[in-house]
Amino acid sequence: MFAVAGAGRALGYICAPVFFQRVIAACVDEPVNASAYAANRELLTQGLDELGYHYIAPDGAFYLWMQALEPDAQAFSDKAKERELLLVPSDSFGVGGWVRVSYCVSADVIRNSMPAFAALKRDYE
């Protein structure tokens, strides 16, 4: 299924080719296991809570919105990148002051990112 999702994303068509329409039709009734996303969301939010970050936890996405520690979300994202954290500034979505944090990674990546989130927070204290 990942290969299908990856190929469709890379194509970027509004009207998918017939082949992809047939593949999706064959897969549409397949069960989705979202438990890994829920576990990762819990792991990330627990870590952010311990560090005192403010965020909005989603009900069904694979990312959350975290309040940037300065009004300029792009500058905050650039500072995070120095800590090897890749955050998407909300300016791209028409709102400032927030960043999007994805948790569609392994649990180890989330665990290993917490020291960087802690260091980033210290940069603003």
Regions found by a protein language model. Give the residues of each.
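PLP-dependent class I/II
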Residues: 1-125
